[in-house]
């Protein structure tokens, strides 16, 4: 480990959607994000990690982006906790994707939850 500082940012534009998740769903989502951050630190040599939570048409969209070395397709298929992230996402009926950031650098892990995962407001 290099001991280099990592800048990290949390952008919550979800309008409180995370507060309405069922506890098991929230825990699974937390674990996926935790694994994505760990991968960025351990394998991607990232200097910056950004977690973004957004309300996208009534569905929670979570993105974990880093500015690291990126990940080739082979690495996506084997190890790095990716199977665990995929499985956790499947268990909460979320879509899961790994791709390069839109600017071509680093990696972006995307989790998109379906609308039925939220408890009603005031419920």
Residue ranges and their predicted role:
Residues 1-123:
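Coiled-coil dimerization/phosphotransfer module
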């Amino acid at each position: 480990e290099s001991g280099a500082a990592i800048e990290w940012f949390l952008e919550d534009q979800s309008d409180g959607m995370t507060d309405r998740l069922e506890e098991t769903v929230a825990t699974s989502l937390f674990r996926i994000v935790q694994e994505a951050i760990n991968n960025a630190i351990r394998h991607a040599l990232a200097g910056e990690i950004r977690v973004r939570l957004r309300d996208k048409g009534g569905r929670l969209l979570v993105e974990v982006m880093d500015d690291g070395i990126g990940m080739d397709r082979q690495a996506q298929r084997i190890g790095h906790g990716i199977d665990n992230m995929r499985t956790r996402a499947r268990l909460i009926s979320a879509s899961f994707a790994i791709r390069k950031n839109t600017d071509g650098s680093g990696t972006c892990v995307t989790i998109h939850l379906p609308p039925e995962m939220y408890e009603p407001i005031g419920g």
